[in-house]
């Protein structure tokens, strides 16, 4: 199937404008997710890898491979994602109210680099719409894989009031999220990355943690696992400061890394936005993961993201210190059954990709 996708289907899709192709893929996955029998057949064909589950953040993941945030922005088709071999899906980024995102064109392919540049700007339907979609299509308690919710700040919200957006989305989606990821690292919402700095970070993360503990106590359940997604463009000194806050506040993990605003020498595109996929982000992400792993002596679980387009690239993330991985751009280039390939290779943790 990988050969058919890469040699027949992908060339057809890549003749379309990138966001149009994304919308076609979204429609196909929504249709698939609405047909449980089809999902079951695809899942059976896929031989979804579940024989070596990963226990992390108090959750059980069928395998080490997740779909990164940005694909299923509104939580509309996690059932289809599960059938394609993923061990978890991260939906979003979602904001309290829906927003259109940045003007088109805002998504660009770089086939020679197996990369994408995006400046989407958190286009989504809002947290209430996501709640309804998850409740209807893949309700908590009837899942075979965890669903994380990636929450962000609305474009119009001042940085000083950003915490209100994160807390609002948390409250709305707490009943359907298995874990939450705090996204303060996208380069496509003006000023968002400033939240990674000392002026905002501690108070923001403390407020979200406080809301989490308060809700858990009120409802008599365990708190949700909380993760933070960071940029690859931070200095190691900045990474140290962020990790220190996460450890102090007992956050459950970190996702490393988001897209980069840097460009490798010789890259043909001059488009602005976040670069994902390719060797440049793969190597930088590996460096950040390994730095965090060593700095924390492995005490802070890491989900590795960035430049995973092969079994070998996925293995590098695990070797660097990641407990699990997420893919997005590599999935676009390698096709719908790429997750299955990765999951089966990674179940042995260190043997199949050598």
Say what each PLM segment does.
Residues 4-54, 118:
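An N-cap/entry alpha-helix motif that binds or orients negatively charged groups
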Residues 154-167, 194-195, 200, 227-248:
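Active-site glycine- and acidic-residue-rich loops that bind
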Residues 92-143:
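A gly/proline- and charged-residue-enriched helix-loop-helix capping module
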Residues 98-114, 263-278, 330-354:
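C-terminal helical cap(s) of enzyme catalytic domains, especially alpha/beta-barrels
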Residues 30, 37-48, 187-200, 243-298, ...:
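Glycine/Thr-rich beta-alpha phosphate-binding loop at enzyme active sites
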Residues 87-99, 184-186, 253-261, 314-341:
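Glycine-rich phosphate-binding active-site loops on the catalytic face of alpha/beta enzymes
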Residues 74-83, 234-248, 294, 298, ...:
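Catalytic cores of alpha/beta
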Residues 59-66, 142-149, 214-234, 294-304:
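Short beta-strand/loop segments at the ligand-binding rim of alpha/beta enzyme cores
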């Amino acid at each position: 199937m990988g050969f058919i996708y890469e040699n027949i289907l992908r060339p057809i899709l890549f003749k379309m404008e990138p966001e149009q192709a994304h919308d076609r893929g979204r429609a196909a996955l929504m249709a698939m997710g609405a047909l449980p029998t089809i999902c079951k057949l695809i899942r059976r064909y896929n031989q979804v890898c579940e024989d070596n589950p990963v226990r992390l953040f108090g959750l059980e993941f069928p395998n080490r491979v997740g779909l990164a945030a940005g694909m299923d922005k509104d939580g509309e088709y996690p059932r289809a994602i599960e059938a394609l071999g993923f061990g978890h899906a991260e939906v979003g980024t979602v904001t309290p109210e829906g927003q259109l995102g940045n003007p088109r064109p805002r998504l660009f392919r770089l086939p020679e680099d197996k990369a994408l540049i995006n400046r989407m700007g958190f286009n989504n339907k809002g947290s209430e719409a996501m709640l309804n979609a998850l409740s209807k299509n893949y309700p908590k308690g009837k899942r075979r894989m965890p669903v994380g919710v990636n929450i962000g700040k609305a474009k119009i919200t001042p940085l000083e009031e950003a915490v209100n957006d994160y807390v609002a989305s948390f409250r709305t989606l707490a009943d359907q999220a298995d874990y939450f990821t705090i996204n303060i690292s996208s380069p496509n919402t003006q000023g968002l990355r400033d939240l990674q700095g000392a002026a905002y970070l501690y108070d923001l993360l403390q407020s979200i943690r406080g809301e989490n503990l308060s809700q858990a106590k009120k409802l008599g359940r365990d708190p949700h696992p909380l993760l933070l997604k960071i940029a690859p463009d931070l200095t190691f000194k900045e990474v140290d400061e962020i990790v220190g806050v996460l450890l102090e506040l007992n956050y459950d993990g970190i996702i490393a890394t988001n897209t980069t605003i840097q460009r490798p020498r010789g890259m043909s595109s001059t488009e602005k936005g976040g670069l994902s996929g390719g060797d440049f982000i793969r190597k930088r992400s590996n460096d950040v993961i390994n730095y965090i792993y060593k700095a924390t002596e492995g005490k802070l679980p890491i989900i590795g993201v960035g430049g995973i387009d092969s079994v070998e690239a996925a293995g590098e993330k695990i070797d660097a210190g990641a407990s699990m991985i997420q893919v997005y751009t590599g999935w676009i280039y390698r096709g719908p059954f790429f997750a299955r390939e990765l999951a089966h290779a990674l179940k042995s943790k260190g043997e199949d990709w050598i």
